[in-house]
């Protein structure tokens, strides 16, 4: 924002997607359904893993935490977005914006770390099966999960720390459906170079490091699979990785669009669409992806349903 006369404000206005009341009503119904499916799908994954002894393995422990993170990620954004569909503009206190951004960044960053941990788990299972029990022990799993949440919190601290040092001025209208960092910077009358660079370096580092771990894991996995003589063994190894690769491609494909591509190459509306995809749609798709192509999950679900009916 250009320097000059301004009035510091304590709340911001989220403009959402559209001013058209009919479109807002349709979007409200669509995203309410998506949010309901997200909550039910991910909660079902968590309950299924907890209640199925055959799923008490490192792979499914990580998956249960991914499901929990997806619930938190979607819940950080969707309720405010639904509220915005009921009115033209959504008023939110700056403190509320800080809390929402902190939650979004925490869960989003934690998801990156968990996806990397899951790639490492698949690497150990396929490339070093005899060492799996020691290299993916319960202690190692707890450390991986704890480090994932800690990494998410640290990254969120860099964003919220910078945001708390900013002042916001009129016009205090944010052209977005939630308190994302970049749109908030546009209405700040006090931001400097560091408030742009520090969060970018922090989030960029997480993306680069986790993508490197995932890519390296799958290079070794691919080499190991190609060395297998058994066709059945190859198919089994590929099937255990397909769901994870699909989830990784969807998640990193969208956040790369946001954080890597030059801002001038896409519009604010395109930014909103991509943001909806990775904060709202992907958390709904993950439990479907991991359920449809996973024999263990399908079998556990059948057993649980059979036990429930008896």
From Swiss-Prot:
Pfam families the UniProt entry points to: 7tm_4
Membrane-traversing stretches: 26-46, 55-75, 100-120, 134-154, 197-217, 238-258, 272-292
Keyword list (alphabetical) reads: Cell membrane, Disulfide bond, G-protein coupled receptor, Glycoprotein, Membrane, Olfaction, Receptor, Sensory transduction, Transducer, Transmembrane, Transmembrane helix
Q: Name one GO cellular component term.
A: plasma membrane
Glycosylation site list: 5, 165
> What cystine linkages occur within this chain?
97-189
Signal peptide, first to last residue: none
> How does the protein associate with the membrane?
Multi-pass membrane protein
In this entry, the parts of the chain located on the Extracellular side of the membrane are 1-25, 76-99, 155-196, 259-271
| First-listed, main subcellular location of the protein, grouped into a coarse class | membrane
**Topological domain ranges for the Cytoplasmic compartment:** 47-54, 121-133, 218-237, 293-310
Q: Which protein family is it in? A: Belongs to the G-protein coupled receptor 1 family.
Q: Relate the protein's function as given in its record.
A: Potential odorant receptor.
Q: What is this protein called?
A: Olfactory receptor 5P80
